[in-house]
Structure formats: C-alpha cells, structure tokens
From Swiss-Prot:
Its EC number is 2.7.11.1. It comes from Dictyostelium discoideum. This is Probable serine/threonine-protein kinase kinase DDB_G0280643. Keywords: ATP-binding, Kinase, Nucleotide-binding, Serine/threonine-protein kinase, Transferase. GO terms for biological process: intracellular signal transduction. Coiled coil: none annotated.
Amino acid sequence: MDIYYILNHDNSDNNIFDFENNSDTIDIGKNYKKCNGQGQMLPPPTLITPSNQNDTITYYTDGRSISVPRKMLIDPNTIVDCGTNGIMFIAFNFETQKRVILKKLSKRMFDNELNGHRIIRNLIFQNLFQGGKHISTYQSIFKRKCSDSYQPPLTSILNSIISSNDNPQQHSTLIQQKDDEDFYFESIQPQYSLLNLISNNMLDQDDICQLFYEILMGLKFMHSAGVIHRDLDPENSIFVDENFNIKFTEFNNCFLLDTDPTFLFNKEYITNTYSYRAPETIWGDSLYTEATDVWGAGVLFAELLLGKRLFRSFNSKEHLKSIYKLIGAPKASEGAYVVKGELLFFLMEYNRKNSFQPTFNNTFIGCNQIQIDLLKNMLCWDPRDRYSVNEILESPYFENIHDRTNFIPCDKNLNVNIHFDILNLKPNQMTNLIDQEFLNPS
C-alpha cells in the first residue's frame, strides 16, 4: 500500500482533474507526495492503469488518512467533516470517468446504534429502489483499513456533542484508530441540489412543471413498493442531474406501509428540518399513508413557485404555528386526528389567542388557478383530504407531459426479515451485515 500526503492547494487550482478522457493513464504526481520510511518526500507513481487502479492508496490530510483505490483521484479542496465519525470529499473515478462523492464512515459510527440503524435502513431501501428512473443509489461500497490513529480537535468534538444533544460521556475522542476498517460509500456527484435551483431563481414555468412532475413520478415509484419517503428535503434528499432529471437520495427515513409498526415511524424519524414534515408526523398515532409524502411534495411545489423556502421550522410547535398562519386553524375533527396530547392543547390555545386571516392567498398571489387548486388540495391539515399522487398527475397542469403508459412500478420485494431485525442489531452485527449484503467485491 502506498502512502501520500496531500499538499496545500490554492482553491482556484482545478488542474487535479486535467486529463484526456480517452487516456488509459492519469498523472497525479503534481498533486501528491509520497513519504518513505525515513520521512523523505518522494514522487508517487504517476500512472494509473487498469492493472493497478484497484490498488489501495492512502492520503493524509490534516492528520487523517483516506484509503481508496488508486483509481479514485481525490480533490483535496473538497474534504469536509460530516460529524465526528466521518468525512466527505469529491474524487474523480478513473474507471467510470465520472466525478463522484465519497463518504468515509468510521466503524465507530455504529457504536451509536441509532446512527447505525439509519445507515442500514438507507442501504436496504437503496437496494429495493435500485434501477428506478428517479432514484440515485451508491455506485459502490468498499472498506479500507486505517493507516494511523486520529483524534479530532476538541472544538469539533464539542460542536458534535452540542448539536446532537448526546451525553458527552458517550462520545469517544479517538475517532480513527490504526487498522480500523472504515466504510466508503461512492455516489455520483449531482449537478445541483433541488434547493440550488429553487433559491437561485434558475427556473421558468416549464421547468417548474417538469421538475414537480418528476418529483411526483419518483414518489409514485416508491409508493408502488409500499414505501413512503418521509424526508423530502430539497437540500439533502433530492438532486437534479446533468440531464435535468430529479434524483431521490437518502432513504434512511423511509417507512414501510402496512408493515412497519407506528412506534417505529416515530422512534427513528430524524430529519434536518421540520419544514417538510406533514402535521400528522409531528405527534400522534395516526395511520400514516402516502398522503404524508403528498404534504412534502406540496411544500416543494410551493417553493418551486415562490423561489424560496415556504417554512423555516426547527421544532414542532414552531412548525405547527407556521402551518396555522399559512392555511388557518384546523377544524376540531381535523385537529384531533392530526395532533395529540400536549400539541393539540397548544394548537387550540394558539388558535384561541390569535385571530388573523391565513396568509395563503397573499403568499401565492402570483400563481394561476390550477396551481392554487393543487396547493390547496395538498397542503391541508387532514391527510384524508389531500389529493393522491395519481389525482395530482391527472391535473390539467400536466396535460402536456403526463404519459400514463410511461410508468414502471418497483418490481422488487423488500427482505422484511432483515428490515425488522434492524432495531435488534448490535454494532458488530450491523457492520457484519454490510459486509455480507452490501459490500462490493474487492
């Protein structure tokens, strides 16, 4: 195994990916230096060939090691932390000739069983949805041994503890230990996140219609497998490729309808923001249905039309107030069905103390009547009153692009036994499961 140190780069230097697409070799010598046993810097082998592209090569940066196949050319300017147990970076895959995102996760990530469960759930649903037109799955999953130990800066550890509200005693400061086996997850680098397109006003009315249509078709595909997505976040879960196609990613919040118990829906439902969560998911033991995703799709449609966020909610009460201000108070029967206990009391008290008109009409003053009708029938308190995905697709809004014959449902069956066993798996069992079920051959 060769070991290299990533040299400091000027952010404007993009030469790391200078190469001829039809070449069998890539020169990486100008970006990295090798260190021999005496600490002397030596030039690395400058040729990547089909015969050596899967050899392990280890790079050091800021005290951490990244061990990848030689065919992965790392862009050192893109290395970022993703929690205390992982880093993420962009690389060029010489074999596929594509820029990719690699996420490196320490096996220690699985010491936190909740994190481990979410990783396994993501892999299970990726396998289920693989091949779907609007699905982006990992291109490969591999593991490599650490070449050295690494302890992150104290500020990084403290920030992680504060942001996660975990017990500090549960955190290990030694995140990477020599000879630990780290997992690497490779995915195609998307052209844009959906949020990029929304917030930068890059879309005309035809673009909005097409993207919203593709969001609905992606949901219809997942729903055909009896699964709801639950986390329609345009920043982290939905991307747009170079051909302007919607791609769904991150399936760790997916919920198996008619099979998953309701307690599981709430037990491990962790999203980055409340802004896309349907009101019935905030509290309660309702029967969750595809209508949960219809609410999220309605929020996305609103944001596509407005060119900005619809809600900015970071806790349950704040989110319920934001919904209340937009569409008004729920009827008594709706409120009791959607929220329970303390939150129902909070909502009724908030309604009693506040008297103002909903902002819906003013918010969407620039939209046409067809768009307004869709929004009203997606963004409603009671999930039983929302349009289904099929009803939305039959709207005149899509009359020029909807092709009823062009839908291919998910034809795979979920391995329910593995799915149910997730909650009972211990850290070593989770890593063994990845080895057995998901790891690419070395």
